[in-house]
Amino acid sequence: MNQKLLLQKIKTNFPKLKWKTVKDVSNGYDHSVLILDNKVVFRFPKNPYARSRFKGEVGLLNFIANKLKPILIPHYTYLPADKTFGGYKIVEGYPFIISSYKKLSNQHKRKLAVEIAEFLSTLHSIKPALVSKYILKDYARTKEFKRLYRRYKKSLYSLFNQTDQSRLEIFFGDLSKVLKEKHDKVFVHNDLFADNIFLNKNNHLKGVIDFTDRAIDDPAVDFIRLWNYNDPGFVAMISQRYNKFQAKDIFYRSHIYFLADTIWNMFNAIEKNKEKEKKWFYRKFKKAYKLIF
């Protein structure tokens, strides 16, 4: 979206709000994001999916904020009458990106694993019935994955060498088994990318943002993005602290889901004929597969 147009929307709806600096951090698929004076974050849904979920997200965040303390989440204080966009006081800290993870000592990693596990335990303990009104029914992702598989299987396999084709066959077999299993479903964030997790200056968990993709699903879903740190030990520590009785299962399922997410992105790159993305996700799949196999 045009930044001038977005700023004009803010001025029109909140004439008393003044600022000197604007930072555009619109690096996601669903929202344009502007930060004013490094104090207030404004999010503007930029597609039908995000727009349909925005109003519910505002209500959800108000409902769960106290339940998740001391971890901070966005609290929208700037909302126009039609609730088509909104602003909140910035969640202070720095995003838990891969380069930040690599700088942490083993002691800090262990402490952070405990904090993330405790956050997930608290989040997942919120009864689905209490938040269901804030969650729209997702489209059939598994059904869509199967459609892409049928249509682009040959194209996908052509990108892999013989050794990796064998690994791909094993993966699809494992995925099929996991998808047939029955698991208790819980309230999940469903998008715990590094950019959505914030640490304070002492490297403790400070806040979590962007609940756009919230869902009722397998708890292992919230462990998927943790594999991006390329450290199985870190995921294992979190899953063990989260639930020592189900730790191995959650560890395994989340890794299978992580691989599936990578293949999903490869399918989309094939469909849109994006050569660089196809190669990038191929390398990511190979690296992710070797983490535990």
Predicted regions and their residues:
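Short, surface-exposed alpha-helical segments at coil->helix boundaries
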Residues: 3-7, 58, 232-236
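Active-site Asp-x-Gly
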Residues: 186-187, 193-252
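ATP/Mg2+ or Mg2+-diphosphate-binding catalytic cores
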Residues: 265-293
